[in-house]
Amino acid sequence: MLHYRTYEISPETPWVTFIHGAGGSSSVWFKQIREFRKKHNVLLVDLRGHGQSARGMWKKGDTFADISREVIEVLDEVGIKETHVIGMSLGTIVAQTMADNFPGRVKSLILGGAIIRFDIRTKLLLLVGRAVKRFVPYMLLYRLFAYIIMPRKEHEESRMAFVNEAKKVYQKEFIRWFSLTKLINPYLTRLQISTTAIPTLFLMGEEDYLFIPPIEEVVRKNKGFEFIKIEKSGHVCNIDQPEVFNKLAIDYIAKIEQKNAVIPIG
């Protein structure tokens, strides 16, 4: 089972589950925990091969569905029937896959630095990465990707946070995660269609230039999706602008909880 950590107020308090991206760990949410645990039960998960979760869990043919199922196993272990899910970067794909395969377990999705389609630039970058992944030290590739995705000086803290976490991931694990990106665009397109019934908020840094255009397009087509740009922020907006990220996410969860509340009659 995946390594996890919980902060629980009471059984009646809504749960919020945090899912980090590839190369990260649950520690990337350090600027969210204090604020969220005030009024929410919090579940932090280390995805396979990351943080304190076991390595070598991969089987041939594993997909995002298998990874999302492992998160559901943690929910079962803790006794969480429903949860709001907050994902970051590639973790947003895991979050959306959970919503697709287990819609009754996901109250809402809050997707930061969301990846819903790779454009020609990111596809070319991934193609080069796949071609050299077994010959080039993975940290060199990861640093390169980090600088391309988070190029500005003001992104330095978030960039270094992800690079430092990635150092703890073995090369074989990195290669496995990297391989999941092959032929992923059709899968991502299907996810945007199949999860429209789940309330979804996209939180994107205004400087997340690689991934914003597809978000704008999908939000125009789906009235149930909401999209907010966070100023002075890049791809990892929960670290670049934590106060803004936290307020927007907490307000959204409160709105969903209010909609779901049962009002007694009489």
What are these regions (language model features)?
Residues 1-17, 38-41, 76, 80-81, ...:
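Alpha/beta-hydrolase fold catalytic core
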Residues 233-246:
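Catalytic histidine-centered segment of alpha/beta-hydrolase-like enzymes
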Residues 5-56:
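Conserved HGGG/HGGXW glycine-rich cap/lid loop of the alpha/beta-hydrolase fold
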Residues 196, 202-204:
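Short beta-strand/loop motif that positions the catalytic acidic residue
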Residues 120-122, 139-194:
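Conserved alpha/beta-hydrolase catalytic His-Asp/Glu region
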Residues 209-215:
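Conserved alpha/beta-hydrolase "acid-adjacent" motif
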Residues 100-101, 106-136:
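Flexible "cap/lid" loop of the alpha/beta hydrolase fold
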Residues 34, 43-86, 247:
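Active-site loop/oxyanion-hole signature of alpha/beta-hydrolase fold enzymes
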